Amino acid sequence: MTTAATPSVGLVGWRGMVGSVLMQRMQDEGDFATINPVFFSTSNAGGPAPSLAGPAGGDTGRLEDAFDVETLAKLPMIVTAQGGEYTKQIHSALRSRGWDGLWIDAASTLRMNDDSIIVLDPINRDVIDKGLANGTKDFIGGNCTVSCMLMGLGGLFKNGLVEWGTSMTYQAASGGGARHMRELLSQFGTLNAQVSSELSDPASAILEIDRKVLAHQRSGIDATQFGVPLAGSLIPWIDADLGNGQSKEEWKAGKETNKILGTSGDEHIIMDGLCIRIGAMRSHSQALTLKLREDLSVPEIEKLLDADNEWATVVPNTKEASMEELTPVAASGTLKIPVGRLRKLEMGPQYISAFTVGDQLLWGAAEPLRRMLKIATGNL
């Protein structure tokens, strides 16, 4: 099933939203030419596998059963975007029978385990390489906002220049999943339908339009996925309530930042803030306050950010550039991580503001997995 040149790789969850983006990126970059893909399905085992440009001329055969541990265990690598429940069920079953292959996973289930590494190679390639050399087998994608933050501000974080920071996020509907994105658009459409005749009349009273919209938001709009209306509003809480006033999404900021960077002791970075769901489709934004360990000028900071990786894009701190380049609309569907609103704050010379945007489905989810697979197969 595997040769030294073209290892077999199990692919699970490839039809979902993150999985679909991952498959498209792998096709775009020619990744299937370096592996023998083995496609698995949780619902259509035996059906035809997708035809992709791999070493077997695109013939990838039939879909395997994603719950067939025996078949999975024959593979040296598995990449999954099937979700946390699948990981809980299958990962432990594989490990308990002695499988020692590489598990590359988009779900958060294994993310904070001591024996796993959160993958974001432009930021922590040294951590990944050390893990591979030391026998680490579980490589997990990070939280989307944390990954996008570090990609944009890597020049500060990697150089040990951040003492602490707060991150106030503006997170897109895609973070909830495909159904959440559909619900957001449906809510916008429903609200528009309530007042379409009034909107077509320039003489109609805007306060009456607003009253009708608000009444529908409060009583008649479908919010099955989000729980409350998001269109024309926001949701000031994401993920579980930890019982201490903090959401799980907010807890991830500090925990994952330090795990990705491998920082501890005196190098530990304190990160906290609030996570907010807004009516954007697929790009997360965040406003940051950072206390630096040194007094750096804004041009020095911009130079560090620009030099760190090819995807971080410094946006000039002007109204025009910010409105055009530092938005979810500008970032969505691209690998660019715009970072702007960089300036010194009134609190002191070591305090700066920053604003980053990144596609939640690319650097926030699929791209780190794609690149980890290339690293694991010796192609990056």
Predicted regions and their residues:
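Glycine-rich beta-alpha junction loops
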Residues: 43-45, 144-145, 169-176, 222, ...
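Hydrophobic, Leu/Ile/Phe/Ala-enriched alpha-helical segments that form helix-helix packing faces
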Residues: 22, 26, 94, 257-264, ...
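General structural feature for long, well-ordered alpha-helical segments within catalytic domains
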Residues: 14, 22, 90, 152, ...
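Oxyanion-binding "anion nests"
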Residues: 217-277
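A glycine-rich, Thr/Ser-enriched phosphate-binding loop motif common to dinucleotide/cofactor-binding enzymes
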Residues: 137-148, 245-255, 364-368
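N-terminal Rossmann-like NAD(P) cofactor-binding subdomain of oxidoreductases
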Residues: 2-225, 266-270, 337-338, 342-348, ...
